[in-house]
């Protein structure tokens, strides 16, 4: 699993690795472009994952039950844009905030396909129309968050066109690439708010944050 995780990390260009949690890797990308990060990175990371999976299968042929599960490994992405506060715990910096909690809640979802890009409405609204039309709306009631408008794209059947960069926003994209026997990665986006944070919804007024 470590080699598969490394392949996805290597493909996460433009994103900073925040930390590893078991089989999960968390990234964030201050100053990134939502459309580019969400449309370009997941397909690249998925392709790198699948290529590495096949290479491992070729280099280490094995018929045991564990190795037979390799073909069933899949990759999933969860994306959200919002605000986070950086919280320092000794020498480590943790990301905190309501939007971080929302992303964790999004991991337990009702998306009916095995490989997907699952995103909140605020992310979907940043995407080009050609990408949005590939998404299927799905409303979730997340614990502690409430009813949330979400969308998903089936990565196995949809060809996501590359994004055309238009403008950059000061924010972060945090990706969690979690590999279990059903390998799961997920992406989320956030606006930075060092002095505090608030949920970012559609129609909310954005205030630029200062970098420390």
UniProtKB/Swiss-Prot annotation:
It comes from the Bacteria. Pfam families: DUF2652 (PF10851). InterPro entries: Uncharacterised_Rv2561. This is Uncharacterized protein MT2638. It comes from Mycobacterium tuberculosis (strain CDC 1551 / Oshkosh).
């Amino acid at each position: 699993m470590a080699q598969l995780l490394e392949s996805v990390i290597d493909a996460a260009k433009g994103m900073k690795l925040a930390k590893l949690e078991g089989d999960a890797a968390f990234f964030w990308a201050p100053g990134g472009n939502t459309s580019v990060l969400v449309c370009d990175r997941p397909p690249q990371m998925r392709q790198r994952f699948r290529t590495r999976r096949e290479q491992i299968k070729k280099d280490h042929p094995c018929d045991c039950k564990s190795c037979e599960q390799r073909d069933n490994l899949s990759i999933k992405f969860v994306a959200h844009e919002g605000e986070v506060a950086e919280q320092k715990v000794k020498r480590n910096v943790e990301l905190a905030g309501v939007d971080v909690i929302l992303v964790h809640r999004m991991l337990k979802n009702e998306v009916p396909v095995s490989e997907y890009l699952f995103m909140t409405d605020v992310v979907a609204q940043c995407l080009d129309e050609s990408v949005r039309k590939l998404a299927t709306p799905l409303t979730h009631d997340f614990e502690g968050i409430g009813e949330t408008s979400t969308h998903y794209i089936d990565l196995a059947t949809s060809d996501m066109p590359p994004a055309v960069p238009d403008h950059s926003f000061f924010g972060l994209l945090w990706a969690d690439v979690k590999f279990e026997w059903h390998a799961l990665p997920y992406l989320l986006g956030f606006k930075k708010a060092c002095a505090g944070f608030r949920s970012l919804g559609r129609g909310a007024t954005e205030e630029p944050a200062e970098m420390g």
